Design a protein with these regions (language model features):
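Active-site phosphate-binding strand-loop segment of PLP-dependent enzymes
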Residues: 1-46
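Short beta-strand
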Residues: 13, 76, 110-111, 154-160
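A short beta-alpha structural unit
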Residues: 22, 122-126, 161-169
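Active-site PLP attachment segment
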Residues: 64-99
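A short glycine-threonine-serine/GTX helix/turn-capping micro-motif
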Residues: 104-113
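Structural motif of enzymes handling amino- and sulfur-group chemistry
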Residues: 112-130, 137, 141-144, 150-155
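Conserved PLP-binding catalytic core of the aspartate aminotransferase-like
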Residues: 136-143, 150-185
């Protein structure tokens, strides 16, 4: 808030934040941040890549779950992770989306996803909009995994989300554990 307060009123301001923080599993305080943005005439840019497909009545993410989608200006999401496809998107006012299409080098100098990928993404989004079963199963699996890790006495950081932050504390040991899980069990750990 101090940065917003120190910024001249007539200067454009953007608050960029995440709905689910990937390193520690915390949820972003979307409503609180949106209120702060309104108070200081800033726009909000919400990264929902760890929330879409997993949270909300139709899988639209944490902002949908919390009933605050109308308070966010721009939402960035992925068609990977919860939707199981490839690619990403932004949703927001047409003028913003047009500016990204016109000026963002990563958008301009890339190839559009192939039609089969788009068809798969559309089918996945449509299915998850009407089926809460996958979200329930995902939350159940996450809770069971958290319980198993805690029961094994592993240093799991408490998190409200589906992300399981397991603190190893030594990068060489962490890499060895990650390699073992992949080669011995087919589990990819990031």
């Amino acid at each position: 808030e101090a940065l917003l307060r120190a910024t001249p009123q007539d200067r454009p301001k953007v608050i960029a934040f995440e709905s689910v923080y990937s390193m520690d599993g915390d949820f972003g305080r979307i409503d609180e941040i949106a209120s702060l943005a309104q108070r200081y005439d800033a726009i909000t840019y919400l990264d929902e890549v760890h929330g879409v497909g997993v949270y909300g009545a139709s899988g639209a993410g944490v902002a949908e779950r919390d009933g605050v989608m109308d308070k966010v200006d721009i939402i960035e999401g992925t068609l990977a992770k919860g939707f199981g496809c490839h690619g990403g998107y932004i949703a927001g006012p047409a003028v913003v989306c047009d500016a990204v299409r016109s000026y963002a080098p990563d958008f301009i100098f890339t190839t559009a996803p192939p039609p089969p990928v788009i068809a798969a993404a559309r089918a996945s989004v449509a299915h998850l909009q009407s089926s809460p079963a996958e979200r329930r199963a995902h939350q159940c699996s996450g809770a069971k995994t958290k319980a198993a890790l805690a029961a094994a006495g592993l240093p799991l950081k408490p998190a409200a989300s589906h992300i399981l932050p397991l603190i190893v504390g030594d990068s060489a040991i962490c890499k060895a554990i990650s390699d073992h899980l992949l080669t011995a069990h087919g589990i990819y750990v990031q």
